């Protein structure tokens, strides 16, 4: 999670690449409000890993305390301390992987503060996010319990900035050693007879910023030292994720790789945010177009970073993990006072941004391993919002519903799409139709985003390498890009059935302005 680094830097330092690798193959110029495309069902890109739909929870504002965790004695309906309605919504969506405890918070978090009897845990100041005191009641056991409740695989971010190799090594043993060692027996004494079997371990977070302000050469040395001691226990595989660049900072990545030599990680992270110049509910058309167009350049970053790592022999086996991404709007002071730091409403514009990102991940399925949007509840581009720490209401945001529309892609084979939409001006990025497709057992799933605030589109989609007789579509749409789901109107923006027709080998539908759609095609 970004600390004091200006968030606009996250989209800087890009280098020029061929547009052909970044956008769907072109089949001619876009005309008026019509967009033509061809799904190439026999040209596979890669598997749409469920982990592309990962999430992130940090001790920040009311994400954990008051959002996910209310405590067992809370008047808020709960399941052993976890907010019941939030758990039910997250289970319904399916959360493949959840990253915790940060973010910036991770590099000041000492895991032993969060184990043992809750009343005996030390109270610590959260130095990164407001200086408030946390009671430590949500720690490792509570996080693993949440993951098990919602069906998520845990991803733990270790402390490099203020921690030590010994501390992180012990955390892994505590979590994964079945029994027999002092640390494993301590876990058992604390109520967990079975090991937690945590595979994913982040070795620091944003080490170029809030994780220690390190030069890439310095962090590479730290990573090499840590990796010597971070072993696997009890048959649980170890997947270490190194802290990666600030946005698309290719210079940082190259210096890290040049210094790394031994100690190759299984994965390397990158973070990508695009800021907003307006309050989430009061975006102008000009700023909307600018934000979404620049945000779409995450595709450049993915392609360029993957290419850079592949240029190193040892880098070809390092997975690319986009473990923080999303839109970061101008936060309203009144919202933070009422609901917590970085509390951000999600609008139809936010849903379009989510759809743009998820389409990009499908199109670049051969280059990515995991993606985690920031964050899961109450903070930035979240899935859920709650009405204050003691409030009993949880609502699903427009971003939640965008993720729901893409859920059926998980595990499918992403395939290529030819389209007549194009981003033509690299210096002044523009918006147009965004599309991706996947297939499985004869089914074709087509996802489309119309991020244009002022133009409805007619879609004409041909199929190659497959046929379809039946089609159904779901549409998430509101002509007002500032529309949101509120506590008074929690279902204002929700997916609804949408007309679609198959005419011979062509699929046709109308795609209104500011909308996200998924079309399911079957033989």
Annotated model-derived regions:
Residues 2, 6, 11-252, 258-267, ...:
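Non-catalytic accessory regions flanking glycosidase/transglycosidase catalytic cores in CAZymes
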Residues 270:
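Flexible glycine/proline-rich, aromatic-decorated loop/lid segments
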Residues 273-290:
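Active-site His/acidic residue clusters
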Residues 289-291, 345-346:
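Extracellular loop and loop/strand-boundary signature of outer-membrane beta-barrel proteins
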